[in-house]
């Protein structure tokens, strides 16, 4: 984490150097959920880890070692503070309703195909054939309320980005 924080600090310093005042932080995707959720600890425990890593361009070289990690609340507070000292607002992104394989690996019942096993993706891209979208179900909306409430407590800015891209509507039909 130490070297990662150093890289992060440098990145924020570069934003400040170039007079950029927003840091859009992409914290979730098909591959992992990268921020601690105390309201949903199983999401952090399971959704932040994938079964391996692929190096290089697709198809790349597969390394079957668990890969993952996440930012704790303390990490987030430190990043937000560091950025604010440089007049930068951090905008977190929680990619929904698509790009949710890491969420669905933790909560398969949130899927439109809940009986099919899900796991966090190893590669990048659009996974329409795997149905990586959240279903419009009451328990999904409860989940979103929990997660957005916690994100609002963590990030003092006025925006949270929800992604919304590459979501195959056919899964909702």
Where are these regions (language model features)?
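Residue-level detector of functional hotspots within protein domains
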Residues: 11-13, 29, 62, 120, ...
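Short alpha-helical segments and helix-capping/turn motifs at coil-helix boundaries
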Residues: 8-11, 76-77
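Active-site beta-loop-alpha junctions enriched in small/polar residues
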Residues: 1, 28-32, 95-99, 165-167
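Aromatic- and acidic-residue-enriched carbohydrate-binding clefts of CAZyme catalytic domains
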Residues: 31-85, 100-139, 170-173
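Short, small-residue-biased leader/transition segments that mark boundaries at the very start
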Residues: 2-7
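An active-site-proximal structural segment forming one wall of the substrate-binding cleft
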Residues: 18-23, 76-97, 132-161
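Catalytic domains of carbohydrate-active enzymes, especially glycoside hydrolases
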Residues: 10-30
């Amino acid at each position: 984490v130490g070297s990662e924080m150093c890289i992060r600090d440098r990145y924020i310093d570069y934003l400040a150097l170039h007079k950029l005042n927003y840091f859009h932080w992409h914290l979730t995707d098909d591959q992992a959920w990268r921020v601690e959720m105390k309201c949903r600890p199983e999401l952090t425990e399971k959704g932040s880890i994938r079964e391996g890593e692929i190096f290089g361009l697709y198809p790349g070289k597969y390394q079957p070692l668990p890969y993952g990690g996440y930012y704790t609340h303390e990490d987030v507070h430190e990043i937000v503070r560091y950025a604010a000292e440089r007049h930068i607002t951090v905008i977190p992104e929680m990619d929904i309703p698509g790009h949710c394989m890491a969420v669905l690996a933790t909560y398969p019942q949130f899927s439109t195909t809940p009986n099919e096993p899900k796991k966090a993706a190893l590669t990048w891209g659009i996974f329409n054939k795997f149905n990586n979208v959240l279903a419009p179900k009451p328990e999904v909306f409860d989940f979103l309320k929990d997660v957005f409430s916690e994100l609002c407590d963590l990030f003092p800015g006025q925006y949270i980005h929800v992604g919304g891209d590459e979501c195959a509507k056919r899964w909702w039909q």
